[in-house]
From Swiss-Prot:
Function: Modifies, by uridylylation and deuridylylation, the PII regulatory proteins (GlnB and homologs), in response to the nitrogen status of the cell that GlnD senses through the glutamine level. Under low glutamine levels, catalyzes the conversion of the PII proteins and UTP to PII-UMP and PPi, while under higher glutamine levels, GlnD hydrolyzes PII-UMP to PII and UMP (deuridylylation). Thus, controls uridylylation state and activity of the PII proteins, and plays an important role in the regulation of nitrogen assimilation and metabolism.
Family: Belongs to the GlnD family.
Catalytic activity from the UniProt record: [protein-PII]-L-tyrosine + UTP = [protein-PII]-uridylyl-L-tyrosine + diphosphate; [protein-PII]-uridylyl-L-tyrosine + H2O = [protein-PII]-L-tyrosine + UMP + H(+)
Stretches for region Uridylyl-removing: 318-675
One Pfam family of this chain: HD
Keywords per UniProt: Hydrolase, Magnesium, Multifunctional enzyme, Nucleotidyltransferase, Repeat, Transferase
Domain ACT: start-end pairs: 676-755, 784-852
The protein, known as: Bifunctional uridylyltransferase/uridylyl-removing enzyme
EC number: 2.7.7.59, 3.1.4.-
CDD domains, alphabetized: ACT_ACR-UUR-like_2 (cd04899), ACT_UUR-like_1 (cd04900), HDc (cd00077), NT_GlnE_GlnD_like (cd05401)
Domain HD intervals: 436-555
One function term, GO molecular function aspect: phosphoric diester hydrolase activity
Activity-regulation annotation: Uridylyltransferase (UTase) activity is inhibited by glutamine, while glutamine activates uridylyl-removing (UR) activity.
Length: 852
């Protein structure tokens, strides 16, 4: 029988096309996985027979193919089983077979082994053992295959296999940061993916509990309710992986940003005012993944307990409801929560209060998972349950652990239904990397760390403030509710206050405490916005902020919540510069609150000048050294710069006020990350654009800029710049900046135009529409330009260039980068901005240029 490769290749292609057509018409994932296996079985059997292999050999499917599941672009894993080592002629024939695999268009992974070699490999590698466990004979010697299966099964130690697979899962979880909620999860390998389901079946098969959900149910491994849930999750993940393979025409199991929107549209999701289509898709994914991780934990613990009955320890009674088994919390009665729903929250209190407990037994987890249904409106209204919930919030230890456990088991979202709505909700806003519920728990974790002595070195100011705060547990309540209204459309800070007030009243908080928590939720973004976007040297800014906070308690609570919130957004968002800005605002506000008076411009200037003169004396400079420079500076300069900066500028410039050459001075930032840079030169229209271009080329991002023109026509500009690549070479960069920037300004070299660089995939696939607004400031002398745009190389240069073209003059710039998102504020004047048409023209042009 000859091998017609072309005919087989055509058959493979036709089968694949027919499978896709059938799936699109029926939406039957199980049928697709089964039918693809059957089609491949048929093709491989034809190929095997056409090459006239000896009857002593066997061809078997292994891995997912052996299990009977072949996704559209899955690899096909084969085992060619030999009775003894292959002869030279057989080896040649096997090589021809492998060549034909590729010729007919199948991606095949294969191994050629004797039975003994299979057993040896299985003993050394748990992955090989797992693949062989699912072997299925395709064609060839049935007796040889039966011998292989019998010996493989005879060598299998179910307990050892269980422990190895559990360890393998732990290692896999570590590769994916131990979370199902990553921005771009792998629907096969990530926690909560298909692999978690397969692990259950592998262990069940090795232990003889069955290879279907129904068989696991019959053998008491899984309950009816859990079986229904797992079947639903498995079906969802199967469909997702199938659609991903068909959409891309190749094997790809990662839900990359590049695919999420297209896949969401494929599922019929439509973007609305509250959520992008991709966010809706991912919320469904995360909720399924969460269910899989919970049930995987329960079922693995259950099978582990069944495999080691002799290791059962004598329970130690904790109270009427609970006992300790080993170091795990166990319920004394399987029907505890049905009989006494009050015990649901007591379970988490027991975990919080008992230092010796490290987890819960499988039956406790299972009972709690089932007990979610007991959390009804009546349960939520019960004073005892409300008291227990408040006790959890007020605990001395284990707060974050237990709230995470409650969230994982679905208890938290049932007790607080509005929290349940944001579980698994991702925010494709270019800076959040956690789902809303995970972000809230991160914020609670940060607040908890402020109270712990072992983290005092990391959060010194926060640790001191929280130790002074009365009833610091109120911050956990504020954290729990600060983002609870995300995804509803509208202002989540405002909408969240309604939920917060209702919770506080229902849970017996005093009027004073309720007012504080509601105020924190309403204003949780304010301190961050003031610190990062407004001029903290302006007494009016500080006075307005003090009017909002009112007293020390509100200021301290808001500072702590703001710090915890920013750090809980993304590891990339926080840096020491933002920490310094927040601390500066806090210190200025607390100083004036303690003095009982709002800051006044004349008092601030006198204080700064006196302090600057005191600092100058340390350098053995005369008492009048400052006079020549300061005569050229107006009050705005002294309001915008600290005493330390004023002294530095004076020290550097007092002897060259009329210098013909530019003066550039740089130094490590005295109060945070990065470098401080001062530029002094005769003023010119495009100076800011030139400087921005230089820093962009040098790999530095400007986070703060103060632009000033002296009375005699010199620019005195100050910058704080951060190294994008975080290189540890400040000394070399100081010398480089001072020399290179001076030379470029002196010789009027062509402007450095920053390279456009590559956009991140996140920016590319979830672009945000630029927002630009220009409004007059409160004094009526300047205009405030605010913009929000996707961050990218050259963004600030684009803004500077556009302002120059429109004849607008820049006074200050506050540059805030939140992950991949830029939120910048500029104080500008000139350019006929008092004319409404000119303002609109500048806004329109900026929006056009800032589009991705």
């Amino acid at each position: 029988m000859s091998c017609d490769v072309a005919a087989l290749r055509a058959e493979v292609k036709a089968n694949q096309n027919q499978l896709r057509l059938n799936y699109e018409q029926s939406n039957d994932a199980v049928a697709l996985l089964r039918d693809r296996c059957q089609h491949v079985d048929t093709v491989l059997e034809k190929l095997w027979l056409s090459l006239n292999f000896p009857a002593s050999l066997a061809l078997a499917a292994v891995g997912g193919y052996g299990r009977g599941e072949l996704y559209p672009a899955s690899d096909i894993d084969l085992l060619i089983l030999l009775p003894q080592e292959a002869s030279a002629s057989l080896q040649e024939k096997l090589e021809r077979l492998v060549g034909h695999f590729w010729d007919i268009g199948l991606e095949i992974g294969h191994s050629v082994r004797t039975v003994q070699e299979c057993l040896d490999e299985a003993a050394n590698d748990i992955t090989v053992q797992t693949a062989l466990l699912e072997a299925r004979l395709l064609t060839g010697n049935t007796k040889l295959f039966a011998t292989f299966q019998k010996r493989l099964r005879g060598n299998l130690d179910p307990l050892h296999f269980f422990e190895a697979k559990r360890l393998e899962q732990q290692e896999r979880y570590l590769r994916f940061n131990e979370t199902p909620y990553s921005l771009e999860p792998n629907c096969k390998e990530s926690p909560g993916g298909l692999r978690d389901i397969q692990v259950i079946f592998w262990i069940a098969k090795a232990a003889g509990y069955g290879s279907t959900w129904a068989e696991l149910h019959q053998n008491g491994i899984i309950t009816q309710e859990e079986m229904i849930q797992m079947e639903g999750c498995e079906a969802y993940l199967n469909h997702l992986r199938i659609r991903l393979h068909f959409m891309l025409g190749r094997r790809e199991d990662r839900l990359l940003f590049d695919y999420q929107s297209t896949l969401a549209a494929n599922y019929g999701f439509v973007s609305n005012e509250a959520k992008r289509e991709s966010e809706q898709l991912m919320q469904v994914y995360y909720r399924n993944a969460k269910t899989v991780t919970v049930l995987n934990t329960i079922l693995l613990q259950n099978m582990g307990a069944a495999l080691t009955p002799e290791s059962e320890q004598t329970p130690q009674q904790l109270d009427e409801s609970f006992q300790i088994v080993g170091n795990l919390l166990d319920i004394r009665d399987e029907q505890l929560y049905e009989r006494n729903p009050l015990a649901i929250l007591d379970s988490f209190l027991a975990m919080q209060e008992s230092h010796e407990l490290f987890g819960m037994t499988a039956r406790t987890l299972r009972a709690l998972w089932r007990a979610r249904e007991q959390i009804t409106p009546e349960f939520r209204a019960n004073p005892e349950n409300r008291a227990a919930f408040m006790k959890l919030l007020q605990g001395d230890r284990g707060i974050v652990h237990e709230f995470r456990r409650m969230n994982q088991l679905g208890i938290l979202g049932r007790y607080l239904p509005n929290f349940g709505r944001i579980v698994g909700q991702m925010q494709h806003d270019l800076f959040h990397v956690y789902t809303v519920d995970q972000h809230i728990l991160q914020v609670m974790r940060n607040i908890r760390r402020f109270t712990m002595s072992e983290f005092a070195h990391e959060y010194p100011l926060c640790s001191r403030i929280i130790s002074e705060l009365d009833r610091p547990w109120l911050l956990y309540v504020a954290a729990l509710f600060h983002d609870i209204a995300k995804g509803r459309g509208g202002d989540h800070s405002e909408l969240g206050t309604v939920d917060t007030r209702e919770f506080c009243v229902n849970h017996g908080l005093s009027e004073e405490d309720t007012e504080l928590v509601v105020w924190l939720v309403k204003n949780h973004l304010v301190m961050s916005q003031v610190a990062q976007k407004e001029d903290l040297s302006d007494p009016d800014v500080i006075a307005n902020f003090i009017r909002l906070v009112g007293d020390t308690r509100h200021l301290q609570a808001l500072y702590l919540l703001t710090h915890a919130d920013i750090r809980g957004t993304s590891p990339k968002v926080w840096n020491n510069w933002k920490g310094k800005l927040l601390a500066d605002l806090y210190y200025q506000a607390i100083h004036h609150i303690n003095q009982g008076e709002a800051p006044a411009a004349h008092g601030v200037i006198a204080e700064r000048q006196a302090e600057a003169m005191r600092l100058l004396r340390f350098f053995a400079l005369s008492a009048t050294v400052h006079e020549r420079l300061w005569k050229q500076l107006d009050t705005v300069y002294f309001l915008r710069h600290s005493a330390e900066e004023i002294a530095w500028h004076t020290r550097s410039l007092h002897y060259r006020i009329y210098n013909n050459q530019p003066v550039v001075r740089a130094r490590p930032n005295q109060e945070g990350d990065g470098l401080q840079v001062m530029v002094y030169t005769q003023d010119q229209p495009d100076l800011f654009a030139r400087i921005v271009g230089f820093f962009a080329r040098a790999g530095y991002s400007i986070v703060d800029a103060k632009i000033h023109t002296t009375a005699h026509g010199y620019a005195l500009d100050s910058f704080v710049v951060l190294d994008i690549e975080e290189r540890d070479n400040d000394r070399e960069m100081v010398a480089y900046i001072e020399h290179e920037l001076e030379q470029r300004l002196l010789h009027q070299m062509p402007r450095d135009v920053p390279s456009s660089g590559r956009l991140s995939r996140q920016v590319k696939h979830f672009p945000i529409k630029p927002e630009v607004s220009i409004r007059g400031d409160e004094k009526g002398t300047h205009f405030i330009l605010s913009l929000v745009a996707a961050d990218r190389p050259g963004l600030l240069y684009t803004v500077a260039n556009t302002l120059t073209e429109h004849g607008a003059y820049l006074h200050t710039a506050k540059i805030t980068t939140l992950g991949e998102r830029a939120e910048d504020v500029f104080l500008i004047s000139g350019g006929d901005l008092r004319d409404t048409h000119n303002r609109i023209r500048l806004e329109t042009e900026l929006m056009e240029r800032l589009k991705v």
